[in-house]
Structure formats: structure tokens, C-alpha cells
UniProtKB/Swiss-Prot annotation:
Its cofactor is FAD. Cell wall formation. The gene is murB. GO terms for cellular component: cytosol. Its EC number is 1.3.1.98. It catalyses: UDP-N-acetyl-alpha-D-muramate + NADP(+) = UDP-N-acetyl-3-O-(1-carboxyvinyl)-alpha-D-glucosamine + NADPH + H(+). The keyword Acetylation does not apply. PANTHER family: UDP-N-ACETYLENOLPYRUVOYLGLUCOSAMINE REDUCTASE. It is found in: Cytoplasm. It is an enzyme of class 1 (oxidoreductase). This is UDP-N-acetylenolpyruvoylglucosamine reductase. PROSITE patterns: FAD_PCMH. Its main location: cytoplasm. Pathway: Cell wall biogenesis; peptidoglycan biosynthesis. It comes from Chromobacterium violaceum (strain ATCC 12472 / DSM 30191 / JCM 1249 / CCUG 213 / NBRC 12614 / NCIMB 9131 / NCTC 9757 / MK). The lineage of its organism: Bacteria, Pseudomonadati, Pseudomonadota, Betaproteobacteria, Neisseriales.
């Protein structure tokens, strides 16, 4: 397919916050074979360039002065079977939840806890998306990339080479702007290995009358939980969890626990402790807070929402207010999850 470039494009349909900003130039990448032509195009070469997936982890505060490329690569295929394991490849532009549901329908298990996470397959390793005790790295085999500095030549990164961390990967650091994710390969399983340890999941399964859950039951429970807590971006603009759960030294967590005995906490790597950002924000009295059309969601304090006409700058100002308030009360720094431009 020939690439089509458009000028002065409204980006509201392409970002889940619904920010009314415009791109100087825009094109959609439907076929990886078009990458060399895209990389050679004057609009790409003069830059800047923003690669866009689902636009669900992005806060746009101003018009974008360069080229926005919407990655719409599609396709899901079973590469091979390895005993009970199924090696499955999904193209970067596939909707994440759609892919999870397709996998479940085929009897390929392991991603059910990650149901209904917004965004695309291509963004999943960048952010190392996670929920309810599972991260994408747990099932990811390798990532297929295009090398942007080598005319789009393909490269494959192993799980280890992706250097996954909490909501982090090599794609946010050395590989940023150099590697474009074009497909992700997963090691899924015919055997169910359910992760139902989170209280919310147990309660939802109980409410659903499920005693012996299947992976599909777990997926349905996760979907029900997320729908009950998180606003639909089609109705109320948002980017899901706006802040990462902070990870602090054990001594700091212990000191906080003395002052706040109800403090939710979870073990993290290197003896550190992960805190619940939503709880910290809630304890500051900010759940449901609103400044104009920029607000903190009234059911999940971790989510910032656009009530209609908030600008990106207003959303950023609200985020800073939340960060400052939490820092003053708890001495804890909150780090935003979305890319802010």
C-alpha cells in the first residue's frame, strides 16, 4: 500500500485523553514493507517524528510540529507448537485486549490477567504492561523490531535483551528512537496456570459463582473489575493509571507504616517495597478532585480524567498538584506513566 501523508490533522481520535491538538503531518503505517519508503521521505527525515500506537499512554500538551506515524500493522499467527507451549506472533498494531481475547478463544493461555488493558500489542513490551500479579515479560519470548537507523532492517530481541523492569524496558532508554516494535512473540500454553491471588479477583470470581475458574473466567473477572473501577476513555478521556506505584527502600516503608498502619505495600526487587499510588492520592483527599475539566477520577484516584474540554497543560498542572501533595504528606515521589509531550 502506498503511504499517504496528510497535513494539519486533528489528533483527538488518536489519543485516549481526547486532547484537541493537531499534527503538522500524519501518516498511517499498514505494511512493514513500506518502512524504507517512510524512512526516506523528506517529512520523516526533517523530523521530529512521533510513533503512535493506541495513544493510550500519552498526554499531548500542544500541537505536534512534525510527523505523527500511526502504527497499524495487523495480524496474529501461530508460529509453532512446543509441547504444551504455543509460540504466537502478534503484529504491533493489533489491539491488546483483542489479541488477549483471540488467544483465549484459541486455547492459548497466560495473558488472561492482562485483559482490557488499553493500547496495542506493540506498546506492551515498551511499558512492560502488568496487572494482577502478571507482567507481559512473563509470557514474552522475543520482540521483532525495525532498526530505524538501518533503513528499517529487522532485528529480534530476546526477553533478556529487552531488559524489563517495572513499567520499563530497553525501548524507553537506549532503543528509544532507534528501534520500532513491529511484532511481539509470546510463549503461551495449552495448560492453565491461573494467577488468582489478588483479593479483587477472588472476590469477583466468588460474586460470579465460580468455584473452579478457567482462564476465561479469570479474564471475565478482570474485565468486570476494570470496568467497575476505570472510566471508559470513549466516555471520559483518560490514559489509565497516570502514576507508577512508587518503589521505596524498606526503611522508608517501615517509617511510613508506623505513621499509617493501613498502608498497602508489596515486596519488590532488591528488598525494596512497592506502595499503592492510588491509596496515597486518596489519603490526600484528592479522589474526585476537579479543577475545571481536569480531574482525579472519583472511583480510582490513580486515574486522571478529562471531563470534556481540559487542555494538556491543565492535565499536566493537575498531575503536578497531585505529585506535590503526595510528596508533602508522605515524602514519596510519584512518577507519571504516560509520555508527556
Amino acid at each position: 500500500m502506498t503511504l499517504q501523508f496528510r497535513a494539519d490533522v486533528d489528533l483527538r481520535p488518536y489519543n485516549t485523553f481526547g486532547m484537541a491538538v493537531r499534527a503538522a503531518h500524519f501518516c498511517q503505517l499498514d505494511d512493514a514493507a513500506d518502512l524504507p519508503a517512510l524512512l526516506a521521505h523528506p517529512l520523516y527525515r526533517q523530523g521530529p517524528v512521533l510513533w503512535l500506537g493506541g495513544g493510550s499512554n500519552l498526554l499531548l500538551t500542544r500541537d505536534y510540529p512534525g510527523l505523527v506515524v500511526k502504527v497499524a500493522l495487523a495480524g496474529i499467527r501461530l508460529l509453532r507448537e512446543d509441547g504444551d507451549d504455543m509460540i504466537v506472533e502478534a503484529a504491533a498494531g493489533e489491539n491488546w485486549h483483542g489479541f488477549v481475547q483471540h488467544a483465549l478463544a484459541q486455547g492459548w493461555y497466560g495473558l488472561e490477567n492482562l485483559s482490557l488493558i488499553p493500547g496495542t500489542v506493540g506498546a506492551s513490551p515498551v511499558q512492560n504492561i502488568g496487572a494482577y500479579g502478571v507482567e507481559v515479560k512473563d509470557r514474552l519470548l522475543e520482540v521483532v523490531c525495525a532498526q530505524l537507523d538501518r533503513n528499517g532492517e529487522a532485528a529480534t530481541l530476546s526477553n533478556a535483551e529487552c531488559r524489563f523492569g517495572y513499567r520499563d524496558s530497553v525501548f524507553k532508554h537506549e532503543a528509544a528512537g532507534r528501534l520500532l516494535v513491529t511484532a511481539v512473540r509470546f510463549r503461551l500454553s495449552r495448560r492453565a496456570e491461573l494467577r488468582t491471588g489478588y483479593g479483587d479477583i477472588q472476590q469477583q470470581l466468588q460474586a460470579d459463582g465460580v468455584d473452579r475458574p478457567t482462564p476465561l473466567d479469570v479474564s471475565r473477572a478482570v474485565v468486570a473489575i476494570r470496568q467497575s473501577k476505570l472510566p471508559d476513555p470513549a466516555v471520559l478521556g483518560n490514559a489509565g493509571s497516570f502514576f507508577k506505584n512508587p518503589v521505596v527502600p524498606a526503611e522508608q516503608a517501615a517509617a511510613l507504616l508506623e505513621r499509617h498502619p493501613q498502608l498497602p505495600r508489596y515486596p519488590a526487587a532488591d528488598g525494596k517495597v512497592k506502595l499503592a499510588a492510588g491509596w496515597l492520592i486518596d489519603q490526600c483527599g484528592l479522589k474526585g478532585y476537579r479543577d475545571g475539566d481536569a480531574g482525579v477520577h472519583d472511583r480510582q484516584a490513580l486515574v486522571l480524567v478529562n471531563h470534556g474540554r481540559a487542555t494538556g497543560e491543565q492535565m499536566r498542572a493537575l498531575a503536578r498538584k497531585v505529585q506535590q501533595t503526595v510528596k508533602e504528606k508522605f515524602g514519596v515521589e510519584l512518577e507519571p506513566e504516560p509520555l508527556i509531550l
